[in-house]
Amino acid sequence: MLKTGKGTEQEVVQVHTRKSSRLFTFFNSQKVVPYVLISPFILSFIVLSFYPTVQAIVMSFQRVLPSEVTFVGLWNYSRILNPTFFTALQNTTTYMILTVVILVSIPMLFAVLLNSKVVKFRILFRTALFLPALTSVIVAGMVFRLMFSESDTAVANQILNWIGLESVEWRYNAWSGMFLMVVLASWRWMGINILYFLAALQNVPKELYEAADIDGANVVQKFFYVTLPFLKPVTIFVTTISVIGGFRMFEESFVFWEAGSPGNIGLTIVGYLYQEGIQQNDMGFGAAIGVVLMLIIFVISITQLYLTGAFKKGDQ
């Protein structure tokens, strides 16, 4: 017997309903839901990070010209071994070490101080410390350039003259140029790191401090034996992002010297990449510099995490 049109329509609706129900059940299962929720991040990572990284690696083996692209093998990497790159590497490493020491130790101490009952108006201080991170680096750099200009009327030189010292040409000496970059970076990011440590301090049980007081522990002993162990995870995190940020630094150098610093005293690896890849339009060589920088950051970060015990299990 032939089925009526009405019966056929009902069967089609039932088939679609069953398919929709299976699809709904599939996407709501405990095994699939986590992947559905993180899929936007995965897609954005592939589009914004993974693909550009692969493209940069491919480009580092090429000579990229406006009219043609030629495969040159390791030629771009062989060109990296030059005095200018080693100067940039030395400047970047020095900057990274100084900023890591400052942006880990000082924010930790400030956070402990702000978390105590000694300081009044703690909420006001926390808000004020976060404001530098919201300030444009270009605006902050221009203010710092005025404060540390070469004239005797600059704020920094007036202070030096007031205590009996001579004026300094801040942007024309190696030590003072490094000082400017480190001070600007510390001013920008110290507040955020303080907030990281403050958040971690909220997880320290107050009972431990009370027990330490009963045992007669002083302030220093309570810091090293009670506070510091609970700050280890966030200390590893802050150290890692400070190391990565130190090697990726570009803005602090650019706002002080723009086109180039005298004697390359402010040249960093990213600045060297910008000069060669963008200004000189040598995209292949610039990509090779970027790949080398990525490898340096990866090796140092993994080594630092291993030495600090970040890969060990919690019960070890």
Curated annotation (Swiss-Prot):
Primary subcellular site in the record, as a coarse category: membrane
Residues spanning the membrane: 32-52, 94-114, 128-148, 178-198, 224-244, 254-274, 283-303
What does the subunit comment say? The complex is composed of two ATP-binding proteins (MsmX), two transmembrane proteins (AraP and AraQ) and a solute-binding protein (AraN).
Q: What is this protein called?
A: Arabinooligosaccharides transport system permease protein AraP
Task: Report domain ABC transmembrane type-1 positions.
Answer: 89-304
> Taxonomy-wise, where does this protein's organism fall, top ranks first?
Bacteria, Bacillati, Bacillota, Bacilli, Bacillales
Q: Which UniProt keywords apply?
A: Cell membrane, Membrane, Sugar transport, Transmembrane, Transmembrane helix, Transport
Per the entry, what this protein does is: Part of the ABC transporter complex AraNPQ involved in the uptake of arabinooligosaccharides. Responsible for the translocation of the substrate across the membrane.
Annotated Gene Ontology cellular component terms: plasma membrane
Organism equals: Halalkalibacterium halodurans (strain ATCC BAA-125 / DSM 18197 / FERM 7344 / JCM 9153 / C-125)
Protein family per UniProt: Belongs to the binding-protein-dependent transport system permease family. MalFG subfamily.
Task: Give me the gene this protein comes from.
Answer: araP
Q: What InterPro entries does the record point to?
A: MetI-like, MetI-like_sf, UgpAE/MalFG_permease
GO biological process per UniProt: transmembrane transport
Pfam families attached here? BPD_transp_1
Q: How does it sit in the membrane?
A: Multi-pass membrane protein
Residues making up the signal peptide according to the UniProt record: none
Its annotated compartments are: Cell membrane
